[in-house]
Amino acid sequence: MSFEYSRKSALRLFLFVLAVFLCISVIATPAAAAEEQTFTEKFYQNFIEDDRYKYLVTGLQNTLIITVFSLIMGLVLGALIAIVRTVHDMKGKLKLLNLVARGYLTVIRGTPVLIQLLIIYFVIFASVDIALVPVAIVAFGLNSAAYIAEIIRAGINAVPKGQFEAGSSLGLPFAITMITIILPQAIKNILPALCNEGIVLLKETSVSGYIGLIDLTKGGDIIRSQTYEAFMPYIAVALIYLTVVVVLTHFVKKLEVKLNAS
């Protein structure tokens, strides 16, 4: 039953997106101009001719790859930063690491992600022959880690202090207590917030084209530069982003329902 419901929901979403695309296209097309291309001709010119749709396919693929691996990097680095800051707050230890972590969070959260991307590509990796996708993953991973660190830290602080005392009474070292008892509870509490961070990250990757990488937005821009038609490529890009975000949001809501029920 749930599979059938999901399939019907996906079909309704596809039809809705298609209807929006068609309605906007019809409204934006001047009917009075006899020499104006028809919708079909414009669609063919923008996406079918010279296989231009492949720019969007390649762009979507790169966008998803960057998002997934940047999120993984952000989770690992963010968890380490959150643990360092929590240990310092609770034990007063790791003062130097905590100072570095606070400086990192201040710099990353206080500067635009686009500037960070440009610095990493044109300054840090200026003399290194490296593919563009890994550069973007590093840039967005470092950016995402700063926000994920605070999310995880908030989740750790939300765990009752008695859990730390329980681990200590069992003779477990602080690190083992943190990894085996505290973090699993914290992750469960903040999982929806982490998923939402992934959605934000997906949209932030739209600036990847500034370093010459063909992401989804850049793919649409390439089509525009070849056809001199801005409407269809950019609307297609917007609808693809919208579709992906709506699907991810749907799964996040289902996840929240399951977590609240457990």
What does each model-found stretch correspond to?
Residues 2-16, 21-262:
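Transmembrane alpha-helices and adjacent helix-loop boundaries
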